[in-house]
Amino acid sequence: MVYNYFMPHFFIKTENVKNNIIEVDDKELLNHLVNARRVKIGEKVLFIDENKIQYVTKICDIERKVLKAEIVDKYPSFRELAIDLTVARCVLKQDADFSAIQKATELGVKTIIPLLCDNCAVKESVVRAKSDKFQKIADESVKQCERADFPVVTEPEKLDEFLKNDSKNYDKILIFSERAKDFGIKKYFAQNPYQKGDKILAVIGCEGGFSDREFKLFEELNLYEISLGKLIMRADTALTAALFGIIQEVGDE
């Protein structure tokens, strides 16, 4: 039976599972459960291990150095995107940027690549200093949406260098651009049918859009520019719409 408590789950290792009890002795997780979430004896808590097995538990003992939870049920987690989807997104101003990472994580992408673009409003030094923060935001979002796996947030890369060096690693590349007009996701996949196992890359611009130099690069690399419709969206909204559109078109079975 699959339970849905609309609550975060917490990551453990199989070594924490002893008979029918989960023993939480990790200091950070123990502190979070006891002092931040203030769990009580008898409260239900969800855990998941590195093998993507989810445990429905009931807290049975809380001590200074360990919390114990009795396993009520366990089952393989189904909360994982079936397609290999990566998003390379130009870095945005802070609130929108964090929102973009959260939404990409919730939508199941495997990899998030921060890009430095010509029209990026954030200095490169600031972006590189935030690399660890980007991964932490993604990790926290995983717990909130009950994903079975963690996305990888890479080190920031310059857009042109990334596309020149790494575009060959993807089977489908979609550059989302306001100038694409009538060529949308549906038309793209009609011309380029998805094959199971294809690695898909979605590239999203920043608030100022792509520069003329970057558009020229897309043409040189024969990359498809994709429209999200007639409306102009904020960059973080465009990311959400683009990823959801790909998932809907390709399917997530």
PLM feature segments, named:
Residues 1-76:
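N-terminal positively charged helical leader segments and presequences
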